[in-house]
Amino acid sequence: MARDEVRRILPADIKREVLIKDEKAETNPKWGFPPEKRPMEMHMQFGIINLDKPPGPTSHEVVAWVKKLFNLNKAGHGGTLDPKVSGVLPVALERATRVVQALLPAGKEYVALMHLHGEVPEDKIYAVMKEFEGEIIQRPPLRSAVKRRLRTRKVYYIEILEIDGKDVLFRAGVEAGTYIRSLIHHIGLALGVGAHMAELRRTRSGPFKEDETLVTLHDLVDYYHFWKEDGIEEYFRKAIQPMEKAVEHLPKVWIRDSAVAAVTHGADLAVPGIVKVHKGIKKGDLVAVMTLKDELVALGKATMTSGEMLQKSKGIAVDVDKVFMPRDWYPKLW
């Protein structure tokens, strides 16, 4: 990694071209609930919080607090953070809980403080850390909840932010499931002095970043009480992102109004229901099925390429896995 500017690009940053199959297709404004028009209760039912996890509690404890605070039946988080680690923890609520699956291919970003066990010239630190970009082989730590099998993970970029003696502050963009503690251990071995992780903070989980949407638990308590006790929903609404935020990075297939109810009732997506698609979809890709109002209908696996979806007139294009939209948002038209 040269000392010039590092291109910080995760899979979530890939721009996709939209290919149109039916230019005349329209959507009925009377049907559905676009993200920006959902009533507050509904917004919460189909929402996801970009939560700033504090160091101390486990990710599961944080989610349990959110459930109790909002009196929810279900909630889930995207990517466990160890108790001592702080930062971006997407927490999906109620009907949106299963959408965290969509964050797996999006990539994550961390800022870590590595403490070296000996003096190393700065040029060597830069050169050695550069070698850890790309495919690496890792074994989960002893305390990990998963089996300790060797596995490959991708490091998209490493950017050194500051070197102060034996302390190296750096930013890393990585594939989901990459252990930063293990990465630092192996960097230390490669430098010939050893190293350990002193601090870690997650700064991105796919489309969720350290930006104006990031909220603390204290913020949530205040905003929730503003809404419930004073009737001021503005702050609480901004603290909860629509579930569609969690699929921003996924390739998408947009469908006509007449196909929505069939999918919400359990049907796979057939070609006649498609209006437009993202370019570059491959068979087996995880895709988001959307309405023409950009509402998330479902997640599924593509059984055709983008080209086949455009060219064919029949057949199943998406094997639907998880449905998020309620069955009564669009009428049955079959």
Show which residues each predicted segment covers.
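The conserved catalytic core of RNA pseudouridine synthases
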Residues: 146-177, 181-182, 186
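Accessory RNA 3′-end/elbow-binding domains used by RNA modification enzymes
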Residues: 1-54, 58-76, 128, 145-150, ...
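Short, glycine/charge-rich beta-strand/loop segments that flank catalytic centers
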Residues: 78-87, 107-109, 141-147
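Acidic, low-complexity central loop/insert segments
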Residues: 96, 101-144, 164
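Glycine/acidic-rich beta-strand-loop module
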Residues: 70, 74-103
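Short, structured patches in soluble enzyme cores that scaffold and shape functional sites
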Residues: 95, 114-118, 159-162, 172-176, ...
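Residue-level signal for inorganic ion chemistry
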Residues: 91, 112, 183, 263, ...
